[in-house]
From Swiss-Prot:
Pfam families: KH_1 (PF00013), PNPase (PF03726), RNase_PH (PF01138), RNase_PH_C (PF03725), S1 (PF00575). It is an enzyme of class 2 (transferase). Residues 557-619 form the KH domain. Its cofactor is Mg(2+). Keywords: Cytoplasm, Magnesium, Metal-binding, Nucleotidyltransferase, RNA-binding, Transferase. It comes from Phocaeicola vulgatus (strain ATCC 8482 / DSM 1447 / JCM 5826 / CCUG 4940 / NBRC 14291 / NCTC 11154) (Bacteroides vulgatus). It catalyses: RNA(n+1) + phosphate = RNA(n) + a ribonucleoside 5'-diphosphate. Its main location: cytoplasm. GO terms for molecular function: 3'-5'-RNA exonuclease activity; magnesium ion binding; polyribonucleotide nucleotidyltransferase activity; RNA binding. Mg(2+) binds at residues 490, 496. One of its GO terms (cellular component) is cytosol. It is found in: Cytoplasm. This is Polyribonucleotide nucleotidyltransferase.
Length: 711
């Protein structure tokens, strides 16, 4: 007999979330089925009993998968089964991973796998906002050491009011879309996009989300009590030698502090200097001793290096590269560097550099999104590439990783709101990171702004981005907020807070916090300091290019749009696409047509004005209504014994009878001298009311000969 344990969370708006354990996947270390409405997510967690020898990090793997059957759909493709993870699934994985990872004990190194699967969906509630809660609940009912519980919610602002976990329909009306993850006491992760909101609005949204999360966390703690999983497993994944730890600190700390305070701006030289201190310490040991103690020395020295860097900032206000806490690295920009793309830019900030290109395309270039719960076409794309050479690493370049998808998505959210809604082009921005020493995603935002303006894209406003950091020791009042952080400051610091925006407000943000007890006062200081940094960077961008170019590059496609009555869509496409394909072959233009808002919307793209004008002329001819008495220049399409058929408007043929070719009597059609392809001026005499056939005449346009008198 199965006796599952169920915990119900009552939400302020009347909706409920249930957490059920003990019914499914009982061999996993922890499993929970979360249900909200008809949306159901199963989260399972499994951890190895021991760590792989030599592992000194947290080998956590989070997977999120949506079943097409959850929404009563078949997957696409020939195999008709789910394939590799979509971008949306990868982004959801990252949201959960970033919320969970900081809460595992520092000395816990066993492999942990968290799997979240969407088994049912109703198209109303958004499952990505529930995945974090499901994963945390699975960890809560397991014996895996974890410093949670946490929960994750989406907060949207709709008509000035904050809504927690809005529906798909509600989110479309929001001017703020923010995902927040937190424990009962502390915010851990924030990510979202917004329509140029203030720093105070962002903080208010985070506070509203945290209040909702507290309810979720309390329910999980009660679930742990009911399940009996409050006591976690014992483990020993690190061996320590306190005498060796003390020896490393005494021998190396002062030297490491001196390097941290030296202000060397070259990260490789600085790292070599740090490494030399450790290597010098190791010289006192034999090879046999280093085989036993080498890994411990490396770990203890890493702690020394971290402490030296942090104390130097807190005590002297001096950063690794010599900057003050609010100082931005030197910036230089260039636009139009690449002649081939339709727009390009280089943005360099210190040792971080992005080379970004822009390509303009037509509707045919749109990205087709076919996720389980979301099907649409995307006209603004941004791709981020992080090759190994950007950090001087000697390794092969593999496919696109989760990090690249996540960084690209953040930059995409930062910029997309500044592309006008009716902009006719499909736009692809590609950022290739040439050098990296911190905040390469923010360099992508800045380079993307420059490249878009260089391409002549009608951006509403330029956008800049900055990454903020924090140094704060537990139990110590003193702290330092850092502007424009280095890679080492991200790694050794307590916060990575990325903020993008225009002069009028924030457009996107991403925050990861590794420290407990971070107050909203500190977050507000970080946001206001970020605003100053963003404005400084914006000034540098607009010095390089003040506004979008007035015209596109000569080799960029030109697009014209026109609307037609929807009943003419079929006439323009033709049977099997014959007419539209023929127009494209004849003119060299690319033509797309679709029905929107009760009319046919046509986009005509070409590399020059002539091909677009030619296509528009043909289309106007097709949709033109033939009028009796009008004169047209037509083309002979076929020759018959009794006359010729003339196409006097695109797709409209009429009979020019042999008797209507000339005033004089013609015995045979050959006497007229007409052949296929000849142009001839005709007048529309009549339209048969029953058949719709057109009767044409050429002779009425000729002078009528005078009648000769009979002798």
């Amino acid at each position: 007999m199965i006796n599952p344990i169920v915990k119900t969370i009552e939400l302020p708006d009347g909706r409920t979330i249930t957490l059920e354990t003990g019914k499914l996947a009982k061999q996993a270390d922890g499993s929970v089925m979360l249900r909200m409405g008809n949306t159901m997510l199963l989260a399972t967690v499994c951890a190895a009993k021991d760590a792989v020898p030599g592992t000194d990090f947290m080998p956590l793997q989070v997977e999120y998968k949506e079943k097409y059957s959850a929404f009563g759909r078949f997957p696409g493709g020939f195999t008709k089964r789910e394939g590799k993870a979509s971008d949306y699934e990868i982004l959801t994985c990252r949201l959960v991973d970033r919320a969970l990872r900081p809460l595992f004990p520092d000395n816990f190194h066993a492999e942990v796998y968290v799997n979240i699967v969407l088994f049912s969906a109703d198209g109303i509630d958004m499952p990505d906002a529930l995945a974090g809660l499901a994963a945390s609940a699975a960890l809560a009912v397991s014996d895996i050491p974890f410093g949670g519980p946490i929960s994750e919610v989406r907060v949207a602002r709709i008509d000035g009011q904050f809504v927690i976990n809005p529906t798909f329909e509600q989110l479309e009306k929001a001017d703020m879309d923010l995902m927040v993850a937190a424990t009962y006491d502390n915010i851990m992760m924030v990510e979202g996009e917004m329509q140029e909101v203030s720093e105070q609005d962002l903080l208010a949204a985070m506070k509203a989300a945290h209040e909702a999360i507290k309810v979720h966390c309390k329910a999980q703690m009660e679930l742990m009590e009911e399940v009996g999983s409050t006591v976690k497993r014992e483990y020993c994944h690190e061996e320590n030698d306190e005498d060796l730890r003390k020896a490393v600190r005494e021998a190396c700390y002062d030297k490491a502090y001196a390097i941290a305070a030296s202000g060397n701006r070259n990260k490789h030289e600085r790292q070599d200097a740090f490494d030399a201190i450790r290597d010098e310490f190791k010289t006192q040991y034999t090879e046999e001793e280093l085989e036993e103690k080498g890994a411990l020395i490396d770990r203890y020295y890493h702690d020394v290096e971290k402490e030296a860097m942090r104390r130097c900032i807190l005590d002297e206000g001096k950063r690794l590269d010599g900057r003050k806490t609010t100082e931005i690295r030197p910036i230089w920009c260039e636009v139009g560097y690449l002649p081939g793309p339709h727009g390009s830019a280089i943005f360099t900030r210190g040792e971080t550099q992005s080379l970004t290109s822009v390509t303009l395309g037509t509707k045919l270039d749109e990205k087709i999104v076919d996720d389980v719960l979301d099907q649409h076409r995307e006209r603004f794309l941004l791709h981020y590439n992080f090759p190994p050479y950007s950090t001087g690493e000697a390794k092969a370049q593999r496919g696109v990783g989760r990090r690249e998808i996540g960084h690209g998505h953040l930059a995409w959210r930062a910029l997309k709101g500044q592309i006008p809604a009716g902009y006719p082009y499909t736009v692809r921005v590609v950022s290739d990171i040439m050098e990296s020493n911190g905040s390469s995603s923010m360099a992508t935002v800045c380079a993307g702004t420059l490249a878009l303006m260089d391409a002549g894209v009608a951006m509403k406003k330029p956008v800049s981005g900055i990454a903020m950091g924090l140094i704060k020791n537990a139990g110590e009042e003193k702290y330092a907020v850092l502007s424009d952080i280095l890679g080492d400051e991200d790694h050794l610091g307590d916060m990575d807070f990325k903020v993008t925006g225009t002069r009028d407000g924030i457009t996107a943000t991403q925050m990861d916090i590794k420290v407990d007890g971070l107050s909203f006062e500190i977050l507000e200081k970080a946001l206001l300091q970020a605003k100053e940094g963003r404005e400084h960077i914006l000034n540098k961008l607009t010095e390089c290019i003040a506004e979008p170019r007035k015209d596109l590059k000569p080799h960029a496609p030109r697009i014209e749009t026109m609307t037609i009555p929807k009943e003419f869509i079929g006439a323009i496409i033709g049977p099997g696409g014959k007419i539209i394909q023929g127009m494209q072959e004849e003119t060299g233009a690319t033509i797309t047509i679709e029905e929107t808002d009760g009319v046919g919307r046509i986009e005509i793209a070409g590399t020059n004005k002539k091909c677009i004008d030619d296509a528009m002329r043909i289309i106007k001819g097709i949709v033109a209504v033939p009028e009796v008495g009008e004169v047209y220049v037509g083309k002979v399409r076929s020759v018959m014994p009794y006359g010729v058929f003339v196409e006097f408007l695109p797709g409209k043929d009429g009979l020019l009878h042999i008797s209507e070719i000339d005033w004089k009597r013609l015995e045979t059609i050959e006497e007229a001298g007409l052949k296929e392809g000849d142009e001839i001026e005709v007048k529309l005499l009549d339209i048969d009311p029953k058949t719709g056939k057109f009767k044409l005449s050429h002779k009425v346009l000729l002078p009528r000969p005078e009648k000769q008198e009979k002798k």
